[in-house]
């Protein structure tokens, strides 16, 4: 079987948490043959992500996190225009979506639909943050664009429906220690999945920041659960992710 790379389909290498060691983190990922897709989720994060793409030749998505909906409309409009003006630099729009833990669901939905319309206009897939709103987000967007459910934590039956409809479930480093996420992997066809770290969050190693190289642990855990070879899992995940982003990575 040909040698393929690991894919961290969603992380935040532009996060300020990496300011002191970003070079080393990216170098460690490259040494482990990890493809990095970083996700700008605020105005500042999107601007930093664009700069990092130029410097490190990594991939990116740009969006606006639902936790930031209290921001002034002018800020949201700046992010909107930034995405529109950099459509050829991005793989997808995201992360965007809704979160049950944040307030003002109506405004969250309005902002999500604004960026969803932009994705339709630009013919881009979306990467969604949908904690507590998995069904709602799916019903709104499923017939409009391709969807990747970042760090999916919803129920198994909805995940199966998402996969059968041709959308993608992203399995994060939570699978290394969460029984629910192990059950998701056990229950879902591998063709429905991609992998991520959500770095610097969700570290599988206690007391450390997460980083893209740890996506290897996700692949290894999936292989263990599925009773498959690591290389076979890598290959399928890579193909799934390239298909979703509509390009070879």
UniProtKB/Swiss-Prot annotation:
Enzyme class name: hydrolase
Sites where the protein binds a divalent metal cation 2: 95, 129, 150
Cofactor binding notes: Binds 2 divalent metal cations per subunit.
CDD domains named among the record's database cross-references: TatD_DNAse
Cofactor: a divalent metal cation
Record protein name field: Uncharacterized metal-dependent hydrolase MJ1582
Residues given in the record as a divalent metal cation 1 binding sites: 10, 12, 95, 198
Sample GO molecular function, one term: DNA nuclease activity
Keywords annotated in UniProt: Hydrolase, Metal-binding
Recorded family membership: Belongs to the metallo-dependent hydrolases superfamily. TatD-type hydrolase family.
PANTHER family in alphabetical order: HYDROLASE OF PHP SUPERFAMILY-RELATED PROTEIN (PTHR46317), HYDROLASE, TATD FAMILY (PTHR46317:SF1)
E.C. numbers: 3.1.-.-
NCBIfam families: YchF/TatD family DNA exonuclease
PROSITE patterns (alphabetical): TATD_3
